[in-house]
Regions:
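Short conserved segments within the C-terminal catalytic ATPase subdomain
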Residues: 37-47
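Conserved glycine-rich
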Residues: 150-152
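Short helix-loop "hinge" at the ATP-lid/N-box region of the Bergerat-fold HATPase_c
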Residues: 73-75
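Short conserved segment of the HATPase_c
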Residues: 110-123
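Conserved DHp (HisKA) dimerization/phosphotransfer helix of two-component histidine kinases, i.e.
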Residues: 1-37
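Acidic ATP/Mg2+-coordinating residue in the GHKL
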Residues: 105
Length: 174
């Protein structure tokens, strides 16, 4: 597992071709993945979604893996009874239009150190998480994949409680 994650991180998995994908199709893929991950852990998921238009030029496999990493982290850290909230929308950020996929959990949120280092390779937060299941690569890989597609990964603490991770994928002008 760790070797596979390292190969993904360092670009040894580049066989997939870039393609034009509608934002509506990507939204459905993101929704389906979030439902599957949440259902596997018996965690409720609430969706807030806008009508999406336009296209993104991306490698769907890596973008999907980035999304699954983000959702898996949220499911792992949330209050299991409250679940997660997924928001899918179009957004203009710094003058560029993006397909934005946001996941909010209801856990303890990010520590100050997490906010600085969470997307860095091999960072896994507190010492209690240094085990076989946490290699500190998930958010680093998600950030790398999104950046390669002209996007970005941002994370915050929600004003009320929990963490919020935002995946932005640049849309094409139509």
């Amino acid at each position: 597992y760790l070797e596979h994650m390292r190969q993904l991180l360092y670009g040894h998995d580049r066989a997939e071709e870039t393609e034009v994908v509608t934002c509506a199709r990507l939204k459905e893929q993101f929704k389906e993945a979030a439902m599957q991950i949440a259902a596997a852990e018996k965690v409720p998921v609430v969706f807030h979604e806008d009508s999406l238009c336009g296209n993104v030029c991306c490698k769907p496999g890596p973008v999907g893996r980035a999304w699954k990493n983000v959702v898996s982290n949220a499911v792992e850290h949330t209050d299991r009874a409250r679940g997660i909230v997924v928001r899918l929308q179009m957004e203009v950020y710094e003058g560029q239009e993006y397909l934005t996929a946001t996941v909010r959990d209801f856990g303890k949120g990010f520590s100050e150190q997490d906010l600085i280092y969470a997307d860095q390779e091999f960072y896994s937060g507190d010492a209690s998480r240094h085990d076989r299941t946490h290699q500190g690569l998930g958010l680093a890989i998600a950030k790398k994949f999104l950046k390669e597609q002209g996007g970005m990964l941002c994370f915050y603490n929600h004003a009320e409680s929990g963490a919020e991770v935002v995946c932005r994928i640049k849309t094409e002008k139509t």
